[in-house]
């Protein structure tokens, strides 16, 4: 089965072709980072308009790269939610228009399910069941993944997502957009232990997260730094130490909660997905913990940590292989800007 996947939930336009026998044939991605940088964040209207401009050229790109023709495609999967309403509508409209014109069925995919399953795109995918740490700009969750569509929420953030805390910390430190990678780069120049920040809910006894207090701690420290240093090299070094303190605190919490989830479920496989999963400090800490505690940790390829069409094509193919009745030829689609992943549980 050959499935075309279309992702447009936020500020990346992604298209891909996934075959259930041959794997990922081609994927193409356009990021809107440069366009949104001058605004310091994603502008929804601009994001939607850019998806319109980019989708069809990306479609031509994946068809050419894969050697596939439209007649070879068996179904079209699209991100139905959650995400920005306008951006979702663009992707859904394009998917259903193509499906109508080509006489193909469609399937709407939960964006987070795509992330959860994205590590299955590697050469040696982890078998079910596993614990998944889903960590991105909008979500931080620990899930037990027993099979496609069989998900149990073990813990989640009670306020800010980890990626959101990274982005807000970047703004407090006067860094550019996107904030997460900028904070991580600055942190690598900081001195470990020079600034020690709180580890929220580290000993809460559950698997939930909270990052708003950590963000507030960064704000408090930044005000002290600005009062003590008028500027110059001293302030820049102090900001690097603060960034290091923030990243160390966030990573400590993510690792500790992941270990607790593995212990609670008695599983030995951890999958990390979402944009923050590309963070080098997080990967290093999890790898060290895995070696010490005797569990396996799996990630998608770095290029597939961000939003992409490959994960949507994969999720669509896996769902249709298990539940062919989910294929739809009713092109009166809806999108779901808010959509609880737990609602997919079978």
Curated annotation (Swiss-Prot):
The role this protein plays is: Required for the formation of a threonylcarbamoyl group on adenosine at position 37 (t(6)A37) in tRNAs that read codons beginning with adenine. Is involved in the transfer of the threonylcarbamoyl moiety of threonylcarbamoyl-AMP (TC-AMP) to the N6 group of A37, together with TsaE and TsaB. TsaD likely plays a direct catalytic role in this reaction.
Q: Give the EC number.
A: 2.3.1.234
Report if keyword tRNA processing is assigned.
yes
> Which positions in this protein are listed as binding substrate?
134-138, 167, 180, 279
- Please provide the record's keywords in A-Z order: Acyltransferase, Cytoplasm, Iron, Metal-binding, Transferase, tRNA processing
Q: Give the residues annotated as coiled coil.
A: none
User: Could you identify this protein by its name?
Assistant: tRNA N6-adenosine threonylcarbamoyltransferase
Query: Where does this protein come from, organism-wise?
Result: Burkholderia mallei (strain ATCC 23344)
Family to which the UniProt record says this protein belongs: Belongs to the KAE1 / TsaD family.
Superkingdom of the source species: Bacteria
Q: Which GO terms describe its cellular component?
A: cytoplasm
- Per the record, the major location class is cytoplasm
């Amino acid at each position: 089965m050959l499935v075309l996947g279309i992702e447009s939930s936020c500020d990346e336009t992604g298209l891909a072709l996934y075959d259930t026998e041959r794997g990922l044939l081609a994927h193409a991605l356009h990021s809107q980072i440069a366009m949104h940088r001058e605004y310091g964040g994603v502008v929804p209207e601009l994001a939607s308009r850019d998806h319109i401009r980019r989708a069809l050229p990306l479609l031509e790109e994946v068809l050419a790269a894969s050697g596939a023709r439209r007649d070879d495609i068996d179904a079209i999967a699209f991100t139905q939610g959650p995400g920005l309403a306008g951006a979702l509508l663009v992707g859904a409209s394009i998917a259903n228009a193509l499906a109508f014109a080509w006489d193909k069925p469609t399937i709407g995919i939960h964006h987070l399910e795509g992330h959860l399953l994205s590590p299955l795109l590697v050469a040696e995918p982890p078998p079910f069941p596993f614990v998944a740490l889903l960590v991105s700009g909008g979500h931080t969750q620990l899930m037990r993944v027993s099979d496609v569509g069989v998900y149990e929420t073990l813990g989640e953030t009670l306020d800010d997502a980890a990626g959101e805390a990274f982005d807000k910390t970047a703004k407090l430190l006067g860094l550019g957009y996107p904030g997460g990678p900028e904070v991580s780069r600055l942190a690598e120049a900081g001195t470990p232990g020079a600034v020690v920040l709180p580890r929220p809910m580290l000993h809460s006894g559950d698997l939930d997260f909270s990052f708003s207090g950590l963000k507030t701690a960064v704000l408090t420290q930044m005000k002290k730094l600005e009062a003590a240093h008028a500027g110059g090299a001293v302030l820049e070094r102090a900001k690097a130490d603060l960034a290091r303190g923030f990243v160390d605190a966030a990573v400590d919490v993510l690792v500790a909660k992941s270990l607790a989830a593995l212990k609670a479920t008695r599983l030995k496989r951890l999958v990390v997905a979402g944009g923050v999963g590309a963070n080098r400090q997080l990967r290093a800490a999890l790898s060290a913990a895995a070696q010490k505690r005797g569990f396996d940790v799996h990630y998608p390829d770095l290029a597939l940590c961000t939003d992409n069409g490959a994960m949507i094509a994969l999720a669509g193919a896996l769902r249709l292989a298990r539940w062919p009745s989910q294929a739809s030829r009713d092109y009166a689609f809806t999108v779901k800007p808010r959509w609880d992943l737990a609602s997919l549980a079978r």
